[in-house]
Regions:
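Glycine- and charge-enriched loop/helix tracts that form the active or gating conduit
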Residues: 1-96, 150
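Arginine-glycine-rich low-complexity intrinsically disordered regions
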Residues: 195-213, 223-245
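Long, highly charged low-complexity segments enriched in Glu/Asp and Lys/Arg with interspersed Ser/Thr
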Residues: 169-210
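Charged/polar, low-hydrophobicity segments characteristic of intrinsically disordered regions
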Residues: 1-17, 26, 109-133, 195-206, ...
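Short secondary-structure junctions and interdomain/linker hinges
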Residues: 1-4, 17-21, 33, 46, ...
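C-terminal accessory subdomains of helicases
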Residues: 157, 161, 170, 202-205, ...
Length: 246
């Protein structure tokens, strides 16, 4: 069976609303070791039973939200599977000497490269997965962030996928989803970039000033109005000759 076909089946399982039960069955039948050996190996190494593991909790949360009608991108589904294998997502915000975003992206890509090649992730799905996992630390404690910082994150192209996974992770860990509600409210009320509330265009940094309107030549003195231009008087319209030569 081709790797593309295997990935299609995995995505179907994760979107079925019964992914926790199905993946647990695959794990105990040793089929998961053939479909996704990295995941099965991680469970074996940590002595986890899938149902009670962090992965099992995420799958249960995923099924709960799927049953309510939620739809997921492939990037979110991959994040549910591989979050434990990419530990960069666990770095706490504001910790001692936190790694830079570039370092997180580099580390995550290095871990996922061999996995993505073997399982034949598309380039887009791999990039989505890396962005989702490495951005998770930014979603903690939104109430303590300035509005400008919240809006900047909401404008990122990966924001919605990353927030979807953040919600799944919160439910899986038994954490309140109040922070998720704050983020969604900010996103709904996000002002259009470069526009004030009154609709006045805001000049962005580095943007050239608009050209000043040209002054009319020989303007009228202050307090006076310029004389109106005289309309050219047109004579009577000439009728075409209709007579013929005799």
């Amino acid at each position: 069976c081709s790797t593309a076909r295997v990935m299609e089946e995995i995505y179907k399982i994760l979107r079925s609303g019964a992914s926790a039960l199905t993946m647990d069955t695959l794990y105990h039948s040793s089929l998961l070791a053939h479909l996704a050996p990295e995941i099965a190996g991680h469970l074996d190494a940590h002595g986890h039973d899938l149902a009670s593991s962090p992965l099992g909790n995420r799958l249960t949360a995923l099924d709960r939200l799927t049953s309510s009608g939620r739809i997921w991108t492939n990037g979110v589904l991959l994040a549910v599977l591989f979050s434990d294998i990419v530990p960069v997502s666990a770095h706490p915000p504001g910790g001692k000497n936190p790694p830079s975003d570039d370092r997180l992206l580099h580390d995550a890509a290095g871990i996922l490269d061999p996995i993505s090649r073997r399982m034949n992730f598309s380039r887009l799905n791999k990039e989505q997965l890396v962005r989702i996992l490495t951005s998770q630390r930014k979603f903690a404690n939104p109430a303590k962030k300035p509005p400008q910082a919240l809006q900047a994150i909401c404008r990122k192209e990966y924001f919605r996928d990353a927030l979807d996974f953040f919600e799944i992770a919160c439910l899986a860990s038994g954490i309140s989803t109040d922070d998720v509600a704050i983020w969604r409210e900010v996103a709904v009320n996000l002002p259009r970039p470069g526009v004030q509330r009154r609709g006045v265009r805001v000049r962005r940094k580095g943007e050239a000033r608009p050209a000043e309107p040209k002054q009319a030549e020989n303007p009228a003195p202050s307090g006076e109005t310029a004389p109106a231009k005289k309309k050219r008087r047109r004579g009577p319209r000439r009728r075409p000759r209709t007579d013929t030569a005799e």
